[in-house]
A protein has these predicted regions:
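Substrate-binding clefts and substrate-entry loops adjacent to catalytic sites
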Residues: 37-54, 86-93, 101-147, 168-186
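Short, functionally critical alpha-helical segments immediately adjacent to catalytic or ligand/cofactor-binding
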Residues: 72-88, 148-155, 199-200
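Catalytic cores of secreted or luminal carbohydrate-active enzymes
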Residues: 189-206
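Solvent-exposed, polar/charged alpha-helical surfaces in well-ordered, non-transmembrane soluble domains
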Residues: 61, 65, 77, 129-136, ...
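Solvent-exposed loop/turn segments at secondary-structure junctions
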Residues: 84-87, 106-109, 155-159, 204-205
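An acidic, Gly/Ser/Thr/Pro-rich helix-cap/linker signature
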Residues: 1-71
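Short helix/loop segments within enzyme catalytic domains
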Residues: 139, 143-156, 160-162
Length: 206
């Protein structure tokens, strides 16, 4: 009957509520800086973001599988979008190299080879493995994926100092604290923008 068909369509629609994430984007999607970057990534920068996401499809299965096997959220895939646009040969002005933008000392600290003959920062697989080692250590240190992301960008010392100065709201989660650091002047501007960019990239990327 038509009623049964309508019911079936409703059931089908409710079964597909759109994209899901394994990092907490919903709690922060109305944060002012997140909204700003969602608008930017969907508007003025949409062509550039689309190009970078297209480039990332080559590496996405590998990155997601490695994060999953390490027991970390697959959607940290979007961190490499912010870092390099999935470019294995990217080099920053600060001489961070590769898809995951490692400085030489950090790369060596997580077991990557960087010398005259081999630079594993430019190897998408080895660099992803190194990023997972580094992010896992930072997550254990700070108890939050978003604080770990901030420390990945700005360094754990800066995040620790910022947390020590922060007037922490009662009942705030560790992830909440990452966004509270964003709202203050506790971190350099690039690092303050980093977590909102990650959340916005995940929202727009899916």
């Amino acid at each position: 009957s038509s009623a049964a068909a309508a019911s079936s369509e409703t059931d089908s629609a409710s079964a597909d509520d759109g994209p899901t994430w394994d990092i907490d984007v919903r709690s922060y999607e109305t944060h002012e800086r997140v909204e700003h970057y969602v608008r930017t990534f969907s508007g003025d920068a949409s062509t550039r973001i689309a190009d970078r996401l297209s480039k990332g499809t080559r590496y996405e299965p590998m990155i997601r599988e490695k994060f999953r096997k390490a027991g970390m959220p697959e959607d940290m895939y979007y961190l490499a979008l912010i870092e390099s646009g999935y470019d294995p040969h990217a080099t920053s002005r600060a001489l961070a190299v590769g898809m995951w933008q490692f400085m030489t000392s950090t790369a060596k600290g997580v077991g990557m080879r960087v010398d005259w003959w081999v630079d594993e920062r430019r190897d998408p697989v080895r660099a992803t493995e190194g990023a997972i080692v580094f992010l896992s250590a930072l997550q254990r240190q700070f108890g939050s994926l978003y604080l770990a992301a901030a420390a990945y960008n700005g360094g754990p010392g800066r995040v620790s100092r910022g947390l020590s100065r922060l007037d922490q709201a009662e009942g705030a989660t560790r992830d909440d604290l990452a966004l509270e650091l964003v709202d203050g002047s506790y971190l350099p501007r690039e690092t303050r923008n980093y977590v909102p960019q990650l959340i916005a990239a995940a929202l727009v990327g899916k």
